[in-house]
Every structure is written in C-alpha cells, then in structure tokens.
C-alpha cells in the first residue's frame, strides 16, 4: 500500500487515490494542486484510459473478424459471437425497424463501458504505485467511468443521436411540434409544453451520466476505503466478496446504459407513428 510506503495518513491515502492526473491547457503543465477547478483543466488519466480501452476493444474485434472461421471457432471467436448475438437480439426486441447503425452502436457502448468499469477490479494500489514510483507521475486514476466528465461525454454523444434521429424521422417541424404541442394540445399551453418536454429531453442524458458515474464511483470508493482503513491481513475478507458483487454491478451498468440508449432512439420511431 502507498500509505505504508509513504507513512501518510488514511485521509492522505484516500485523497491521493481520488486525485486525477490533470493538465492545465492554459500553460500545458501538470496541475500540482488538485483543489484548483477550471474549465481549462483536463483529467488526462481518464482520457488516456478511455482511448486505450477503446483501442483494445477495436483490436480484439478486428483480430477476431480477421481470424474467424466457419469451422470449429476459437474461444475468443465464440465469446465475440455470443456477445454480438446477445446485443443484436436485445436491439431487435427494442427497435422494431431496420437500422444498420443501432446494433453496432449498442455493441460498442456495452463493451467500451464494460471495459472502463472493469478497471475498477484492478488492485487499488497497483497502477498508482507504478505511476508514482517508477514513472514519477504524481497522481493516477484508472477507472474512466468513475469520472463524471467521461460519463457526461458519453451521455452527450447519446443526446446528439437522440436529437439527430428525432430530426431525421420527424423533420424540424415535427420535432418542434412535439416539443410545443405535447402533452397539452392547445396554443395557450405552448410555453408550458416546451418547458416540460425540454426537461424530459434533457433528463435523459443527465440520468444516463449520473447513474453510471454514481455506481462506479461508489464501487471505487469502497475498494479505496477497504485498502485505506483495514489492515492488510483482513482486507481480503471484505474485498473479495465485494469484488464478486461488483462484477455484477459493472456488467449491469454497462447493459443499462446500452439498453436505455437504444430505448431513447427507438422512442423517436414510436412517437412518429
């Protein structure tokens, strides 16, 4: 544990593990004071691991596609085919229309978020220890989905797709009419309708982002508290059962994000009918 190596307090240990490696875009220097808040500060550790996991996902699926065989499949090909079939079935159950983009999008969202969540199961001190004492990096957080900036970015992408499909299917006039003439179909209620529908529309990406962030951040915090508060010989008693339970949580959160994305897009088709 870093706490034992540095002889720091439990508070310092927890604070260190919740600190990001940040870059100040004003002068392109690393931020030495994590308490500084600015729009021009990037959590470069979250961005790095998000991109890295995305590349790993693409490489695995590209390799599987290149080596796929119609004969006896490899274990990797079997897993990928099961995942593709599972996602495709769920998308078809939700979206009752032909769209070649939605299933690949759902697969990408599920696998990418699952890989980000999976980083939460790594040993709490492993990568931060390597970063500090070998690479001389002052801080490092390795779970991208425990960063609200990442989950909001993902949700923003979903929100753009929701707007795009609403405009594509209903047209600008139809979309504006939906925002202003529902739920009360009278001209006098246009301001009220617009407020209600706008809140409903904006709540979709916000709820997606906060749900994913809250669950994964809480799981990360529990692991840090176990490592920071308990003696080393007793940590396994709690951390192993929590890790087993957390496997369900990280999978479920990736699945929920994926399903709700498809549901929100499907609503554009259903409401048009």
From Swiss-Prot:
Task: Tell me which SUPFAM superfamilies the record gives.
Answer: F1F0 ATP synthase subunit A
**What GO terms in the biological process aspect are recorded for it?**
proton motive force-driven plasma membrane ATP synthesis
Keywords for this protein: ATP synthesis, Cell membrane, CF(0), Hydrogen ion transport, Ion transport, Membrane, Transmembrane, Transmembrane helix, Transport
Q: How does it assemble?
A: F-type ATPases have 2 components, CF(1) - the catalytic core - and CF(0) - the membrane proton channel. CF(1) has five subunits: alpha(3), beta(3), gamma(1), delta(1), epsilon(1). CF(0) has three main subunits: a(1), b(2) and c(9-12). The alpha and beta chains form an alternating ring which encloses part of the gamma chain. CF(1) is attached to CF(0) by a central stalk formed by the gamma and epsilon chains, while a peripheral stalk is formed by the delta and b chains.
> Which family would the database say this protein is a member of?
Belongs to the ATPase A chain family.
Name the HAMAP family for this protein: ATP_synth_a_bact (MF_01393)
Main role?
Key component of the proton channel; it plays a direct role in the translocation of protons across the membrane.
Protein name stated in the entry: ATP synthase subunit a
Q: Which organism is it from?
A: Baumannia cicadellinicola subsp. Homalodisca coagulata
Gene name of the encoded protein: atpB
């Amino acid at each position: 544990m870093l706490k034992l190596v540095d002889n720091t307090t439990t508070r310092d240990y927890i604070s260190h593990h919740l600190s990001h490696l940040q870059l100040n875009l004003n002068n392109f220097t690393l931020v030495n004071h994590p308490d500084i808040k600015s729009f021009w500060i990037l959590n470069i550790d979250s961005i790095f691991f998000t991109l890295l996991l995305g590349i790993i996902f693409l490489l695995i699926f590209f390799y599987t596609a290149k080596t796929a065989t119609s004969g006896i499949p490899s274990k990797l090909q079997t897993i990928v085919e099961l995942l593709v079939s599972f996602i495709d079935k769920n998308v078809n159950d939700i979206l009752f229309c032909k769209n070649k983009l939605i299933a690949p999008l759902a697969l990408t969202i599920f696998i990418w978020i699952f890989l980000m969540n999976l980083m939460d199961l790594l040993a709490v001190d492993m990568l931060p220890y390597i970063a500090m004492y070998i690479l001389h990096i002052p801080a490092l957080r390795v779970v991208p989905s425990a960063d609200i900036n990442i989950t909001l970015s993902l949700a923003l992408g979903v929100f753009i797709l929701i707007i795009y499909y609403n405009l594509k299917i209903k047209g600008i006039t139809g979309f504006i009419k939906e925002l202003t003439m529902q739920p009360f179909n009278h001209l006098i209620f246009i301001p009220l309708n617009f407020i209600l529908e706008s809140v409903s529309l904006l709540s979709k990406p916000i709820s997606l982002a906060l749900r994913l962030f809250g669950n994964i951040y809480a799981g990360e915090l529990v692991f840090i508290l176990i490592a920071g508060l308990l003696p080393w010989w007793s940590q396994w008693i709690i951390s192993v059962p929590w890790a087993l339970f957390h496997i369900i949580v990280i999978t479920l959160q990736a699945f929920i994000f994926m399903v709700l994305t498809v549901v929100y897009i499907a609503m554009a088709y259903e409401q048009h009918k």
